Amino acid sequence: GAGIAVSSLGHQDPELLLAISEQASKLWHTSNLFLTEPPVRLAAELVDASFADRVFFCNSGAEANEAAIKLVRKYTYLEHPEDEREILSFDGSFHGRTLATVTATSQPKYQEGFGPLPGGFRYAAYNDFEEAEKAIGPQTRAVLVEPLQGEGGVNPARPGFLKHLRELCD
């Protein structure tokens, strides 16, 4: 099942319905164990339109965020002690329902009942330049941020906030 984010696709868009029915008449789903043309084509388009040279497809936002968290942990495992492998997230965020993404989500209502939660996460106020500056330090290895928070009340990042985070990370 897909999450609520798919609602952004609208309702019965003719172009989307046509694409879905054309694909359904060919092949539905094969998992990532088989190479098929549509994801290969999409991967090439994503690489061409971005800074990346690789693509990792996931089934959900939670799975994508979990993979990002694991990548950070694995990448920093040999180079940094455990207390210097922190991931910063923001109040009002929602990153998924896996154990790591629930922990990255700084909302107790989603974390309650799942303790003890994994360590290595820190939280700061969303859109607060000064608090972000205080939170990001030598122990920070990643910043997990939503440009537009949905669960927190449809809160867009203030102008310059994401750029400021990027500068702090550099």
Residue positions per predicted region:
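PLP-dependent aminotransferase-class I/II
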Residues: 81, 90-149, 153-161
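Residues at alpha-helix caps and immediate loop-helix transition turns in enzyme cores, especially N-
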Residues: 1, 12, 157-161
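Active-site-adjacent loop/helix segments that line or gate small-molecule/cofactor pockets in enzymes
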Residues: 33, 125, 170
